């Protein structure tokens, strides 16, 4: 049956099949080949020009977007054909695939499109590049390294396939991890080395500061016995009898320095003596505990004697006795035991002979002068201060030749003499402190009332 003549009528322009296949292919975005150039298929290039007299091959209307211009590249002049061109209705013969002989692409961001994420996923360039049959699919891989690089843990790799229709979700890297474990380890090593250098700088600064302060402390400790004797004597010369009688605080300040020096020195001697191991023989054990008990008693009496002697009312004789005589009694024995004797179990020896014997003799003379007459009080302070000053000068400038005694008996005699002098002095101080406290607080009467009395027969 013959077809009607209506099929020869021209097709309206708003018909969906108005544009031919060549026009539709011309409106598609250009493709890319292996060389990175944009080239249309030969079928589209052959039918891109409209032929006169054919209404179906007219140029596109104003509503259709114009074709994009071809971008120039460094491989513009190379001859390349696609391996699988689209079939053309007018060209029935199929072209054999031709392998491209283009030079290798220049290394850059376009040479490795599968290693970098696309900056604009919706662009036609990214879509056509991913759709090209000659390039592998663009796969974005993210490497996640363990938090503890020291442990032997294999890195887990998560691959996320990117589609040309779905947008890419960019995940920023963690600031605490790096993509290279060697870089991470070097960063940690630099941090540790910087911290160690800072700690070493602090330790060096502290050691240098301690080394600078050590001579100052040594100077203060050297002049402490001399100042402990002369300071109360100067206070006695500055203030009169009435000032000491009215002000207990002035009496406390006058006695604080000599008693504090003796208490500190005996406490240090007791600590150093107790730090050594206890000897095994019976004789050494007896000496060890006896000397420990004496040093501890001297420390306690020196601390407790400050308050009773400050509370006592000083008359004319007491205003000379407490500031002048007491420091000359308490300071020299403590100074001798701390500076001139090496108190170690089984190794007790005298380090300085001449000045130590002189100080011991001067202390005995002071005791004899004090108990004889009141007018000899100032001489005790003068003799003690001069002997201590000579000891300090001999240690600093070597005025006297320091040589130990020839025999062990002489060394033991000097040590025993010093200990006997210290025992007499601190026994007198302890008795005086108890007497003053009993006079003020009547301690003995209260103790007698508390203790049970014997029944009368």
From Swiss-Prot:
InterPro entries linked to this entry: UPF0328
A Pfam family it matches: DUF2463
Composition bias type Basic and acidic residues, residue spans: 74-94
Coiled-coil segments on the chain, per record: none
Region of interest (Disordered), ranges: 1-112, 157-183
Biased composition (Pro residues): 102-112
Family: Belongs to the UPF0328 family.
Protein name: UPF0328 protein ECU05_0030
